[in-house]
């Protein structure tokens, strides 16, 4: 009961300013410490309002833009702050350090992104970060792979410019023999006024003959060549044959099949008009077939 009376008296004394009870005295030291702490907090808040520095670009804090740039470049900053001056805190007593990106394998992420720590401004770090990104991208140049449309000159079978592995003089000599045999075949076996050949056809045929004769003891000199003409599908006519070297015994044969090219406009002209105008021309296709037949046993 005594404690309850004291509590009521204390309440009355605090309300009306009366202090007649001497056996209970409140300590004023805790109140003074609380007032000092409150004043210190308010002072720091007021001082902080004057020195608050937040960089905003296009309505977003620089830290948000920095994070988005890291996401766009597939790099993430590490959580450990960089050590400057023996790992001490930043100038001004701050204990928060700037983060540096992790080491990555991409050319952009492999650059050095260490920003200057003087001042501790987010704008300075942002500027240094973007400068390092642009410089590392410009320094590392990777050539683009070749386009699949850029095909090589040797891709087509028997191309005219695919003659590096054969003798040019042998190709020229054998090509002249082929042209002479085709002129004679036109006069004797082909009912036409002229025969047109692709410009590089005889050179390609000669090169293929030489390649197919490489494993033979005497090369192309021991070859007998048969020339056949296919005017229609499954309609083949032999128009010429000759020995490449008459003084060498033939030990293998090659069968050359030429085809008529019907992709030109002259194939659309009726045959009786060709006979009236005497303009019957046979166009030889650039495609040909070369078949080898050995006359001896390899065993």
Swiss-Prot record:
Regions of compositional bias (Gly residues) in chain numbering: 84-96
Gene Ontology CC annotation, any one: cytoplasm
Record keyword 4Fe-4S present: no
Location relative to the cell: Cytoplasm
Keywords (A to Z) from UniProt: Apoptosis, Cytoplasm, Developmental protein
Start and end residues of each stretch annotated as Disordered: 73-103
Gene Ontology terms describing biological process: apoptotic process; head involution; negative regulation of growth; negative regulation of signal transduction; regulation of TOR signaling; response to oxidative stress
Induction or repression: Expression is controlled by homeobox transcription factors. At larval stages, induced by starvation, and mildly by hypoxia in midgut but not fat body.
Key word Ligase present: no
Protein's job: Inhibits cell growth by regulating the Tor pathway upstream of the Tsc1-Tsc2 complex and downstream of Akt1. Acts as a cell death activator during head development.
Protein family: Belongs to the DDIT4 family.
Record's protein name: Protein charybde
Native organism: Drosophila melanogaster (Fruit fly)
Gene name linked to the record: chrb
């Amino acid at each position: 009961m005594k404690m309850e009376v004291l509590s009521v008296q204390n309440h009355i004394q605090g309300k009306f300013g009366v202090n007649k009870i001497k056996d209970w005295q409140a300590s004023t030291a805790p109140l003074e410490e609380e007032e000092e702490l409150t004043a210190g907090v308010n002072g720091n808040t007021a001082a902080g309002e004057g020195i608050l520095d937040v960089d905003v670009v296009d309505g977003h804090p620089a830290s948000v833009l920095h994070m988005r740039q890291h996401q766009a470049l597939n790099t993430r900053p590490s959580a450990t702050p960089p050590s400057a001056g023996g790992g001490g805190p930043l100038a001004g007593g701050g204990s928060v350090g700037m983060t540096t990106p992790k080491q990555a394998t991409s050319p952009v992420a492999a650059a050095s992104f260490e920003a200057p720590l003087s001042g501790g401004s987010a704008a300075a770090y942002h500027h240094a970060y973007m400068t390092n990104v642009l410089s590392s991208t410009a320094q590392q140049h990777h050539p683009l792979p070749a386009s699949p449309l850029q095909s090589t000159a040797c891709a087509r079978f028997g191309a005219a410019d695919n003659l590096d592995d054969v003798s040019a003089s042998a190709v020229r000599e054998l090509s002249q023999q082929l042209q002479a045999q085709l002129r004679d075949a036109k006069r004797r076996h082909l009912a036409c006024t002229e025969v047109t050949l692709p410009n590089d056809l005889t050179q390609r045929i000669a090169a293929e003959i030489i390649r197919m004769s490489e494993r033979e003891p005497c090369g192309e000199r021991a070859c007998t060549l048969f020339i056949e003409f296919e005017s229609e599908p499954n309609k083949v006519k032999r128009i010429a044959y000759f020995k490449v070297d008459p003084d060498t015994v033939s030990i293998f044969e090659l069968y050359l099949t030429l085809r008529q090219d019907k992709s030109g406009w002259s194939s659309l002209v009726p045959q009786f008009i060709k006979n009236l105008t005497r303009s019957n021309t046979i166009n030889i296709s650039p495609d040909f077939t070369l078949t080898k037949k050995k006359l001896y046993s390899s065993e």
